[in-house]
Amino acid sequence: MSNNNNKDDSELQSRTHYYNPDRTAIPVKDDVDQLDKFGSPKLSANDHSFTNTDSVTSEDRPFSSPVSTLTSNSANFSDSSLQNSPVHPIPSPALSPTLNLGSRPDVKRVSSGGYFALPKQLTSIRQTHRPMSQQHRVPSFHPASDTAPPSPIPFHHHLRKKGSSMSIPGQTSIVSSNNGSEATNPPEEKLAIIMVGLPARGKSYIVNKLVRYYNWLQYNCKAFNVGNFRRKHASHSHDDASFFDPSNEEASKLRESFAMDTLDALLQWFEEEDGVVGIFDATNSTSKRRKAIVDHLSKVPYVTTLFIESICNDEQLIAANMRMKLVGPDYKDLNPEQSLRDFQERVRMYERKYEPLGKSEEDLNLRYIKVINVGKKVVAFNIRGFLAGQAVFFLLNFNLSPRQIWVTRHGESVDNVRGRIGGNAELTPLGRQFSEDLALFIDEKRDEFQERLYNDYSKESHLLQHGSHSFNGKQFETSFNCLTPSENTVNDPQVLDPEDEERLEKPYSVWTSMMQRSIQTAAYFDEEQYDIKAMRMLNEICSGICDGLTYEEIKSIYPKEYEARKLDKLNYRYPGSGGESYLDVIYRLQSVIVEIERMKHHVLVIGHRVITRIIIAYFLGCRREDIAYLNVPLHTVYCIEPQPYGTDFYQYNYDPNTRKFSRVPFSL
């Protein structure tokens, strides 16, 4: 029994604890000079000797208590005040669960259940009763050395770092802690997108779509095409297939030089023109080239790199892309048959050394996206960052299916006649007439487009059987792999299947806002033939306290607001509950734009002035300074047809006297 007691005493003696005051302590006025800059008592070699050994683990301190564990048998006090301090060996609760020290002033109980002695020198620190926070954890110290360390630096002074998160134009801002004011928050992240892929695989198509999307979201985005740089700086305008032969060392060095010069131009644009997303458009077909690009970009710490590879194994898509190349800058005004053979040879040169994205990039922990057959399959690896995530999101939601996108404003409303903004007015008689004729007009155009699809299908079936086609009006024979269906059918290869002709019958959607004037404009569409849906995202911009006023009334009642709007219409936000800016509406419409890109069928959007401006600005790729000033009058209908080479636009004006829509030159 006595042996057990001695054993317990030994264990108890080896587990002696001391209390080190927390950082929430409030010093007595006379003792301020005895504290260091972190509020801790100043310690010197003459006070005591502590060594930070952190012998207590996080499991020993379940509530992050400021526990300082000290082995008493190695203590070496030189200061008499500390030597005379009552040091009480206190066992842990597991050794003495019934121990009770009452209210002794020199002992403090902590949340883990143990007790700690207060050295006399520290009793002048008046303790607060607030619980210790995680930020004020104190390291453990052991009197196991002859040299006293400096006062321990709190945990947060070691590891606290400024975070970096998404910056959205018009939606995020920097708040100053000094006066609570807000400032614009330019994106800290800059994204360099590096394209990868063989020629005629749709890289430039993806590039153009991404440039338009990022710029529409108000991120400054620009593409840098190595081919354009080569044509601009080469000694002659056309390089035949031999220039792309990997065994041609002189040409290979020249191509590498063009690539690095183009990359330098991208970095210069980042630095000098506040670029946010730069796209490096080239084949970048080998791991060696891609590694050189990463090494080059790594010199700039604020740039994130994302590779996007475009893969296409659909012969019809490749054929269509090849035909587009034959009318491009490398083969313009040249013999089409000879140009086709040269381009095919160029592709074979690249195929000899082509290395797809994969293990080599994964071993380097690089970010990449593989887009297969224009978005039918998308593979993403190690995607991090808001801007890179936007690219993945967008590439998952676009296609090349032939379709029509119609955009118009609602018919004339009562508030339009009165000149009042906002509100929820009904249509005038003229507005209802426009609505009725609009339904008939869309019916007519729907039938015309359907007939065009059938005609194209018949023509392509004939070409597939006879193996001939024409370029620039010249007829020549082609092999099956080089057959080039028309833009309309090749974009959706499934329409070429004779057993699946029902795909030629395109469904149709009609979208309105939640406001009466928009819903009433769709009233004459047959619900059996059109999917009619009202969307709150399509509501007109909310004008806050200016809702229901004319512009003259705003100028008179709120002159400062009137002038502020004139100075910066895109960024100006109407004051008052729910007031919005153009940038607010852009992000409200983001899901609408992505859904339009995703859909393979027709849609008519019946919106409002700001809504129509923003949607058309997206498809046109308008500059940010032009978006808020596009001319989109009432009773004008816009038709948008996505194509592999871009977008076709048509404009139709309504004549209320003849009740007809006539096509006019597109203008905004």
UniProtKB/Swiss-Prot annotation:
Residues 1-105, 136-185 are annotated as: Disordered. The keyword Nucleotide-binding applies. Its EC number is 2.7.1.105. SUPFAM superfamilies: P-loop containing nucleoside triphosphate hydrolases, Phosphoglycerate mutase-like. It holds the Pfam family 6PF2K. The keyword Calcium does not apply. ATP binds at G197, L198, P199, A200, R201, G202, K203, S204. It comes from Schizosaccharomyces pombe (strain 972 / ATCC 24843). One of its GO terms (molecular function) is ATP binding. GO terms for biological process: fructose 2,6-bisphosphate metabolic process; fructose metabolic process. Synthesis of fructose 2,6-bisphosphate. CDD domains: HP_PGM_like. Beta-D-fructose 6-phosphate binds at R346. It comes from the Eukaryota. Gene3D superfamilies: P-loop containing nucleotide triphosphate hydrolases, Phosphoglycerate mutase-like. One of its GO terms (cellular component) is cytosol. This is Probable 6-phosphofructo-2-kinase PB17E12.14c. Residues 46-56, 65-86, 164-184 have a biased composition (Polar residues). The active site is at D281, C312, E540, H608. PROSITE patterns: PG_MUTASE (PS00175). InterPro entries: 6Pfruct_kin, 6Phosfructo_kin, His_Pase_superF_clade-1, His_PPase_superfam, P-loop_NTPase, PG/BPGM_mutase_AS. Keywords: ATP-binding, Kinase, Nucleotide-binding, Transferase. Residues 1-14 have a biased composition (Basic and acidic residues). It catalyses: beta-D-fructose 6-phosphate + ATP = beta-D-fructose 2,6-bisphosphate + ADP + H(+). It is an enzyme of class 2 (transferase).
